[in-house]
Design a protein with these regions (language model features):
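A short alpha-helical cap/connector motif
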Residues: 1-171, 175-246
Length: 246
């Protein structure tokens, strides 16, 4: 306790990230290295995530098409390293508006919110189609910040009613299927600010018919994408051109 009060605690080691660049240009290329600091309030976030995982398997939403299907919170959560990256992006970019879909159990939302609290500005809009998962996510994110709105419903159905301004950072992490993600991206890109950052989780999802690797490659190859990098073999990040118009 005395060491904490005197500011003598050891600095926490940075998270090391494995990067694979597809387009090494733009803001991402200038600022993103293979190392980011640990997120603010990380011990609390990971403690909440562990408590959530102890709830055991939770039923999937009907939209996933798996009758009787379940997932454990640990399987669908963002990794702690990616969480550090999310908080770092927020602190570096100072976004006014972050959007994520789906929220799952709120781990990514907690990391985004930790970055917003550290920055002292901005708002997270989170969407989750599973009402039971949404309740847990809302409670978890609320343990970090009040700078968020959690909407029960699909992004593509509700975004026009909920998010009024341009989106600066977006996390796409809902149903992992090529056509579904592409339809969501078509809606999302019209609302992104110039130079905005889009994160695509689970690009390594290889269930038959998912084609998530193909989604990532097609989006990264677009001419209006300034930078594109793969993180930990799982997360794709694209930086939209600063000259594009919303």
């Amino acid at each position: 306790m005395l060491r904490r009060l005197l500011g003598l605690t050891r600095p926490q080691p940075n998270s090391q990230l494995r990067l694979a660049w597809l387009k090494k240009r733009g803001w991402l290329a200038a600022h993103l290295t293979g190392s980011v600091p640990q997120a603010p309030r990380k011990p609390h976030i990971e403690s909440v995530a562990a408590a959530t995982d102890s709830l055991g398997p939770q039923a999937l939403a009907a939209e996933y098409g798996e009758v009787g299907g379940t997932r454990t919170p640990a399987v669908v959560r963002s990794s702690s390293r990616c969480g550090d990256l999310y908080a770092w992006l927020v602190q570096q970019r100072s976004p006014a508006t972050i959007v994520e879909f789906g929220a799952a159990f709120g781990v990514s939302g907690m990391y985004f919110s930790a970055g917003l609290e550290a920055s002292g500005a901005g708002h997270l809009y989170s969407f989750e189609i599973n009402p039971e998962w949404a309740e847990i996510a809302e409670r978890n994110i609320g343990s970090i910040s009040t700078r968020f709105t959690l909407t029960r419903g699909a992004f593509e159905d509700r975004v026009a009613d909920v998010v009024k301004g341009p989106i600066d950072i977006a996390l796409v992490d809902a149903i992992h299927q090529y056509d579904f993600v592409m339809r969501q991206f078509t809606i999302l890109e019209r609302r992104m600010s110039p130079g905005g950052i889009v994160l695509l989780d689970d690009i390594d999802f290889d269930r038959p018919g998912a084609r998530m690797r193909e989604v990532w490659q097609d989006l990264a190859g677009r001419p209006d994408v300034a930078g594109a990098v793969e993180v930990q073999g799982r997360l794709g990040i694209i930086e939209l051109s600063a000259s594009r118009r919303t």
